[in-house]
């Protein structure tokens, strides 16, 4: 099991929203696809994410540093202990290799967007909704009765 490609593209939001300090007319967002070699219905399982409607696209850092680090890693080093799925924490650790301590604001959106796409792929490979995968991983499998 391996990640075969990670693609990022910037798209304009094309929004006319504005307030007294900011407008979105030039705002862009990064859209990411994490493409795996796991096949479902004849197509590779892919995880998707976008960065935010309040942040500009951040693909330069993704393409220069974070995507190459993931794609050049030993594929087995990115898997969970069972070897049946990816481990988002291990992928995060690969992205953070050779990054200096601190300075997280510059990279947080780029890394976070890739990480969300990885989680989406993990849930699809597991054949479960992402909220269930997260509950199993971080809340002893307990789903909240309500969110708010």
Regions found by a protein language model. Give the residues of each.
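Proteins with a high burden of low-complexity, intrinsically disordered sequence enriched in S/T/G/P/A and R
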Residues: 12-22, 58, 100-102, 139-148
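Short, surface-exposed, charged/polar-biased interaction segments
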Residues: 24-27, 34, 70, 135, ...
């Amino acid at each position: 099991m391996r990640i075969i490609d990670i693609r990022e593209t910037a798209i304009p939001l094309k929004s006319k929203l504005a307030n007294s300090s900011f407008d979105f007319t030039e705002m862009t967002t990064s859209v990411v696809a994490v493409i795996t070699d796991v096949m479902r219905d004849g197509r590779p399982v892919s995880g998707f994410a976008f960065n935010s409607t309040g942040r500009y696209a951040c693909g330069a850092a993704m393409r220069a540093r974070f995507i190459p680090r993931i794609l050049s890693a030993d594929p087995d080093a990115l898997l969970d202990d069972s070897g049946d799925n990816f481990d988002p924490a291990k992928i995060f650790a690969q992205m953070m290799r050779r990054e200096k301590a601190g300075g997280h604001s510059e990279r947080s959106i780029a890394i976070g967007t890739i990480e969300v796409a990885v989680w989406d792929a993990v849930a699809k490979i597991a054949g479960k909704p992402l909220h269930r995968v997260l509950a199993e991983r971080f809340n002893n499998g307990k789903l909240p009765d309500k969110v708010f």
